[in-house]
Amino acid sequence: ILVARALFPDTPQVAVFDTAFHQTMPRAAYRYAIPDYLYREHGVRRYGFHGTSHHYVGRRAADLIGKPFGRCNLITLHLGNGASATAIQGGSSIDTSMGMTPLEGLVMGTRCGDIDPAVPFYLSKHLGLDNSTLENLLNRQSGLLGLCGDNDMREIQRRADDGDEAAELALGVTAHRLKKYIGAYL
């Protein structure tokens, strides 16, 4: 902000918070089943991400079907190297696949999405991985990249079309997770 202000002193600045759209989620959707003090004292809860995208897509869908956004119940998907799903009821986010961080949820280009929370403990114990290494593994070496060695969906689709089993698996795992979230939001 300071650099932009120095470089463009006469240009208004606007801050957009990617999590803001998800602030309408009910407590049952944003709270984790962990001790209450972790939420109250440390803010450990689900925040969601890609809110600007989900809000735009929801409003655009409402326009296309000719219905006020506030009367729409929708499931929106943000699909790219980062990916998320959001349930919208009456124009408000009521659930989303990403949690406290973007790591939770759908399979992404390099992020694993949902996994058993004990997997990092297992990897730490059996492989001696520290927190920094685990964070890098789950955020930057997993997802599509971890499943098939590539995080470009166009290349993965091409490889799958050519019979590459790892690429087929990556597409299958991604589709399974998408169907799981969409089904939960119906």
What are these model-predicted stretches?
Residues T19-H22, Q141:
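Short glycine-enriched loops at secondary-structure junctions
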Residues R71-L77, S132-Q141:
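Beta-strand segments within the central parallel beta-sheet cores of soluble alpha/beta enzyme folds
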Residues D10, L64-R71, H126-S132, A160-A166:
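Short, glycine- and charge-enriched coil/turn segments that flank and shape catalytic ligand pockets
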Residues G48, T52-Y56, A83, D114-A118, ...:
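Conserved active-site and cofactor/substrate-binding residues in soluble primary-metabolism enzymes
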Residues I1-A15, T19:
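Conserved phosphate-binding loops in N-terminal lobes of ATP-dependent enzymes
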Residues N136, R140-G149, M153-L186:
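Adenine-nucleotide phosphate-binding core of ATP-dependent small-molecule kinases
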Residues V3-A6, Y56-L64, V119-L123, T133, ...:
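Alpha-helical scaffold segments in soluble metabolic enzymes
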Residues Q23-H126:
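Glycine-rich phosphate-binding loop of actin/hexokinase-like ATP-binding domains
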